[in-house]
Structure formats: structure tokens, C-alpha cells
Design a protein with these regions (language model features):
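Metal-associated gating/positioning segment near the N- to mid-region
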Residues: 18-89, 148, 172, 177-180
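His/Asp/Glu-enriched, well-ordered alpha-helical/loop segment
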Residues: 159, 230-233, 241-328
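Histidine-rich, glycine-flanked metal-binding segment
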Residues: 1-21
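Short, acidic/polar
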Residues: 53-61, 109-122, 168-173
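Active-site mouth loops of central-metabolism enzymes
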Residues: 41-55, 100-116, 142, 163
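Active-site core of metal-dependent hydrolases
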Residues: 107, 132, 138-243, 261, ...
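Divalent metal-dependent hydrolysis catalytic cores, especially in the metallo-beta-lactamase
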Residues: 54-80, 94-104, 124-136, 163, ...
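Divalent metal-coordination and catalytic microenvironments
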Residues: 17, 25-28, 68, 97, ...
Length: 346
């Protein structure tokens, strides 16, 4: 939104009684996750072709953009790279995309082997590194990576100029990741006051989920059931975790000084409904609307190291704009009714 050249004739938009906001930023999605032709969660062994996967990912990206998400971080699969590059060169409509291209875990090797794999991700074009330091919530969420593994991976990422994000549910996994200097914790459902204060001291970002991801899994249970740990035990765990997730978001968003950003973990079935998690933060977890929106714009841009171009409406910033009817600070559900999206001035 810098100075216009002399003689420039631009369009005028009459948005009426609307809230105009910076484009929303979702720091945790999975754009390549989709339901296949059999209406089941896609896996690499279901017979779907790469072309089918590309079409599905493109549709997910478009749905995400039209919901008001103009930038997202897909964490992550190798297919994200082609999707990112196609969007960035204007071949496909979609949100500005960053990706980890995959993830590393306790099974990825010794500290030295982890360093080598971080370098390999960088060489392949990863924008960020993702680590799994704990089990899935469907398996209890306990710590898996050792302190030495976390230290090596986070240190190598920083040496290469990459941010390092860590999937961690258990407080001990969160603490280990924070002490290792990692940049952001994903989920954090079992966060304690002690680890949250440590995050405040270290300036670590937190991306918790309020309800969309669990509700989406439960609503689409038949499409996931029987694949990997999407079993009866796993679904029971997710059902039991729903109120805990909301309580955790309530606790973390009321922890003074904690950098809480907007990340939905949107998977197959949730793309285009990302704002439901933001509405949950406001209406169910009690986060003040402006603080919730700050976490989905300015603060999220800072977490991506893109605050010099995204996240605020100001001169010389990229023109990412979203409009919803009425006053979103009085009615958070207005976020469901996005009627205007501009990304990069288009």
C-alpha cells in the first residue's frame, strides 16, 4: 500500500457497513490433506493419482483464501512445495504459503543425523522446520524427542536462518523445546503455568487450537476411522480433549505477555472453515475480540518474520484485506461471512 504512480487509475470498492481487516494468517494448516474419491481420508496407499492430489490441494487452497486467510503455513508435506510455488507465481489462487515440506521426530536419528536432515530440508526449499517432540493427542501426547535431539535440530535450523516449530502436547515436551531455543510450540494442550511463564521469558510463540480440529475429526469420523491411530481409542481421546482444548486456550490467552498466535491445524474437512477456531477463542474461551484478531494478523506476521510486509493496514505494507459485514468485535460469527478478499492488491 505504497505511493501510486502518477496517472494511476484504480478501482474503488464500496464495502458499506463492514469491518475491514488485514488478511488473516493461519500459522498451522495441512493443505494437502483431503478426502479421496471414496470419501475417505487420503493416504499414499489408496490408489489416488498425483493429479487427483494436486486438484484437491488446489481446492483446499482456494477455500482457505476465500475464508479470509491470505497467508498460511502448511506443516507439511513434500507436495506443499509445488502448491506454494504455483500460488506464488500466480498460476493458482490461494493464500501466500510457507511450508516445512515434512517433519522430523525421535525416529529421525541422532543429533548429528537430525542436523543433516534439517540441512536437507533447507536444500529442498523448506521455509520452516517442524519437529514432533510428543506423541499425538490420540496416543496420549507424551514427550518423544530427547533434549539433545531438540537442541540439535533447533540449533541447526537457526544456523540456516530457519524458524523451528515444535508439535508438543505434554508440558515436559514443551519445556524441552523452549529450553532448546525453538521458536514456536504447536498445540500445548497440557501446558502448565510453569512452562507458560518460561515461554513468556524466552519469547516463544504458542499456537493452540480451540476446537475446530477436534470437532472436524469427530464430524468426519467415518472418513478417518481405521486409518492409523484414528481408531476408537483415538477418537475417545479427541472427544475428551475438546473441553480441555478450550480451557487451555482460555488459560494461555489470559497469560500476560505470552505470544499466542492463530493456528488451526486444519486438516481434511476443515479447509475453508479456519475462522471457526477464531470464533471459538472469542465466544467459548473468552479471548477479547481485538486480541484474537491481533493474534491472527500482526502477531502472526511477526511469528513468520513477515511483519515488515504483512499483518497491518499501513503504507508500504502488502495490500491483504478482508471485509466482513457489521462489527466483528461485537459479533465474532461475522467472520463466517467474509464477502471481500484482497491478497497483494488483487
Amino acid at each position: 500500500m505504497g505511493a501510486l504512480p502518477a496517472g494511476f487509475r484504480g478501482a474503488r470498492y464500496a464495502l458499506g457497513n463492514a469491518t475491514l481487516m488485514p488478511g488473516l494468517i493461519d500459522v498451522h494448516t495441512h493443505l494437502t490433506w483431503y478426502f479421496n474419491a471414496q470419501d475417505r481420508f487420503h493416504t499414499n496407499s489408496d490408489g489416488e493419482t498425483p493429479g487427483q492430489g494436486a486438484i484437491a490441494a488446489s481446492a483446499n487452497a482456494y477455500a482457505t483464501l476465500m475464508s479470509g486467510i491470505t497467508t498460511t503455513q502448511s506443516l507439511g508435506s513434500p507436495e506443499d512445495r509445488d502448491l506454494r510455488d504455483a500460488i506464488n507465481r500466480g498460476a493458482l489462487p490461494g493464500p501466500r504459503l510457507l511450508t516445512s515440506l515434512g517433519s522430523l521426530s525421535e525416529a529421525s536419528g541422532t543429533p548429528d543425523e537430525l542436523r543433516a536432515k534439517v540441512r536437507a530440508f533447507k536444500a529442498r526449499g523448506a521455509d520452516v522446520i517442524k519437529l514432533f517432540a510428543s506423541k499425538s493427542i490420540r496416543d496420549g501426547g507424551g514427550q518423544t524427542m530427547t533434549d539433545a535431539q531438540l537442541q540439535a535440530a533447533c540449533d541447526e535450523g537457526h544456523t540456516l536462518g530457519l524458524r523451528v516449530l515444535v508439535h508438543a502436547h505434554a508440558a515436559e515436551a514443551m519445556k524441552a523445546a523452549v529450553n532448546a531455543g525453538c521458536d514456536q510450540i504447536e498445540h500445548g494442550i497440557f501446558a502448565t503455568d510453569e512452562v507458560l511463564q518460561l515461554m513468556v521469558q524466552k519469547g516463544t510463540y504458542l499456537s493452540p487450537q480451540c476446537g475446530l480440529v477436534f470437532r472436524n475429526y469427530l464430524d468426519n469420523r467415518a472418513k478417518y476411522q481405521g486409518i492409523g491411530n484414528y481408531n476408537d481409542v483415538g477418537f475417545k481421546s479427541m472427544e475428551e480433549s475438546m473441553p480441555l482444548g478450550i480451557a487451555t486456550v482460555r488459560k494461555v490467552t489470559h497469560t500476560k505477555g505470552l505470544k499466542v498466535v492463530f493456528g488451526t491445524d486444519a486438516v481434511a474437512g476443515a479447509h475453508g472453515r479456519n475462522v471457526e477456531d477464531l470464533i471459538c477463542r472469542i465466544n467459548e474461551a473468552g479471548q477479547p475480540p481485538l486480541e484474537a484478531l491481533h493474534g491472527a494478523t500482526t502477531l502472526a506476521a511477526q511469528s513468520l518474520r513477515l511483519a515488515d510486509s504483512l499483518g497491518t493496514l499501513a503504507p508500504r505494507m502488502l495490500a491483504d484485506l478482508v471485509a466482513v459485514p457489521g462489527d466483528v468485535t461485537r459479533d465474532a460469527t461475522a467472520l463466517r461471512r467474509v464477502f471481500f478478499v484482497m491478497k497483494g492488491g488483487r
